[in-house]
Amino acid sequence: MPRHLLIAFALVATLCSATFCPAKDRNKDKGKAKSTPLRSIHLDRAGKKWADKTLRKMSPEEEVGQLFSIWTRVQFLNDADPIFIQLSDSIRKYHVGSVVMSVPVDGPLLLRNQPYVAAELLNRLQKASKLPLIVAADFERGLSMRLYGTTVFPHAMAFSATGDAENAEAFGRISALEARAIGVHWNFFPDADVNSNPANPVINIRSFGEDPKQVGDFVAAYIRGAHEAGMLTTAKHFPGHGDTATDSHLGLAQVSGDHARLNAVELPPFERAISAGVDAVMVAHVTVPALDSDPTRVATTSKAIVTGLLKEDMGFKGVVVTDALDMAGLTRIYANDVGRAAVESFKAGNDVLIIPADLDASYRSMLQAVRSGEISRSRLDESVRKILELKASVGLNKARFADLSQLSREIAKPENVAVGQRIADEAITLVRDNGKVIPLQSSVNSVGTPEAALPYQSVPVVSNRLVAVIFSDDLRTDSGRMLERQILARVRDAHVIYVDSRSAAGMTPSVMQAIEGADHVIAALYVVPVAGRAIRTASGGVTNTVAVDDSMGALLNAILDRAADRTAVLAMGNPYVIQNFPAIQNYVCAFSNASVSETAAVKAVFGEIPIRGHLPVTIPGIASRGEGIERTAQSNAGGSNNVHP
C-alpha cells in the first residue's frame, strides 16, 4: 500500500525535533504580555539526564502506569472526600503519568470552577504522585472552557474568519501563560481537522476552516504562540476528522477519501504542525479504508496509520496520544475486552493512552502484554522515555507545583481580555443583508436610552419595538445571557424571549404576538458542536448538537414567514444552519457562543464596530469561502453591500 511521502519539511524535521523545537522570537505579535517572562519548552542536558536516570530505576509496573492519563474534574475536595481519595489512590496504585483536567458535568451543564480551586487541587495531586504528573487539558477556547474568571476566546473558526493568523498566535501565548499559572502544561489543541463536510456533527467550528492551507497557517501560528509561553501542543485528530458525518464519541466514524484526497486535504495541516514543532499528535477513532482496509481497525489501533504513516512517512518524532479510549468509536469494537483497546493502541504506535474505559482492566492488560513479551521492554522504554523527556521539557524535573500567589497577576489580565474581545469583534461576518437591516436602524418610534449606542436615540420607551428570540441549546445553560445583557444595555425596553427544544412549540403563540408590532427582530441561534452529546427531539428522535431541533426550526420558520425582512438571524456557532432556512434574509455569523462573541455580535448589529469578517468555509447554495459583506462602524443600511473575496 503506498504511503504519503513527506519531503518538503524533511530537513526541518531532522534538524528540529518535533517535540522540542524552540519557538521563534516574534516581537511584533499582537496581545503579547510584555511584563511576563516567557518560559520556553526546552529539554536541556539536566532534563535528559533526569529522564535517563528515572527510567533506569523504574519497574515494569511503573513504566506501564506512565502511559496512562486519567480525568481529574476540578472542584473543591476535602482530603477525606471519597472522590479525592479515589483519585489520589489511582495515581499511586497505577503509577499514572498524567491527568487530564476537566470539570464535573450535570446533563448539559459544565460545572466550571475558579482558577484557585484548579491550581490547589492539581498541586495536591502532584503531591500524591511519586513522579511529577504532566497535566493536560482541552483548552480549545482557552481556560474559560473550564474555569470562570479567565480570558475568554471564541472557537477556532472565528480566528480564521478574521483572516489574521497572528490572532491565533496571540491566543496560543495568552492561553499558555494562564494554563501554566494554574499548573497545566499540555493543551490538546490546535485542531488540525479540515472541516470540509458541512454535516460534520463534532468538528464544525472547532476547526479553522475548509481550506488546508489556511488551517495549516493557523495551526502553526497557535503552536508558535503556545511554545513562547511554555505550553505543550497537540495536533488533532489524525489523520483527519473533518470529512466525517458521525461523532466518534457516539459511534464509529469513517473517513472515506482516497489517497489523493488525504494527501491534498486531510494531511497538510498535520504536516504544517509537525514542521512548526508540535509536541504531540492525537489519533482519532475513525476508520480510513484507504489506509487500512480492516473495518475493526480505527486509526488509533492501526499500525499502518500510526507507525507507518505518521511516524515513518511523515517523520513525526514526538509523542503520539490516543483520543479518549472510553469513546464509543472504540469501545463498541472492544466491548468484550476494553483492556485490549489499550494494548492494540500501544502496539499501533501510540505513546500515551488517554482516559481508558476501565483503568484497572487496561493497566492489567498492558502489564500482561509486557510480561508475556507481546510488547517488548524496549518498545515500552521508548514511549516512557518520551513521556519523561516531555515532562523535563516543561521543567517538571525541577518544580511540579503551581505558585498560587501568581494567579492574581497572570489570569485575565485586562490587556489579554481585550485581545479576546478584539478577535471576536474581527470575526463577525455578514453573509446576507437582503432586508438592509444591518446595522439596525432607528425609526420614527425608535427605542433606546441616553446610554444606548448609535444608531438608536433616546426616546420614550415603547414595548416590543425590538424583540430578541434566543434559540438556546438548553435553557439550563448560560447561552444567550451575555447577548441579553448587551441588548438591554442598549435598548432597555427590548423584549427578550428564550426558547429551547422543550419549550419552543409552547412558546410559539407568545413569540408571534411579540414580533407582530416589532420594528426589528433578532433571532440568535445557539447551535454548537458538543462532543459526545445527542439531543432528543420533540418528535422523539435524536439529533446532534449542530442541527436545529424540529420544534425550534418550526418556530424560526414562523418568524421568517411573518417578518423575514426585518429579522436579523445571528449564528452563534454553526455557520451552516442557514442551509435549512432559505427564507433568512439577514444573516450574521459569530462562529461561537462564547461571551465575547455574544458581545461582538450585538456591537456589530448596532453598528458600533466595523464588520470585516469573511467565511472560512463554503455554505453550499448560500455563499463561498472568503465571502463577507463589509460594513463600516456606525454605518446605515444603505452602506457598502459589496462581497469581498
Tell what function each PLM region has.
Residues 65-71, 97-102, 132-137, 141-143, ...:
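Structural recognition of the beta-strand scaffold that forms the well-ordered cores
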Residues 56-59, 83, 90, 109-129, ...:
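Second-shell residues forming the walls of enzyme active-site clefts
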Residues 54, 62-135, 139-142, 193-206:
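Short, well-ordered alpha-helical
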Residues 8-17:
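Bacterial N-terminal signal peptides
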Residues 1-8:
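Bacterial N-terminal signal peptides that target proteins for export
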Residues 71, 90-112, 198-199, 274-297, ...:
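Short acidic, glycine-rich surface-loop motifs adjacent to enzyme active sites
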Residues 161-184, 191-200, 204-206, 212, ...:
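A substrate-binding/cap region within the structured catalytic cores of diverse enzymes
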Residues 23-89, 303, 312, 333-645:
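Preference for extracellular/luminal or secreted protein segments
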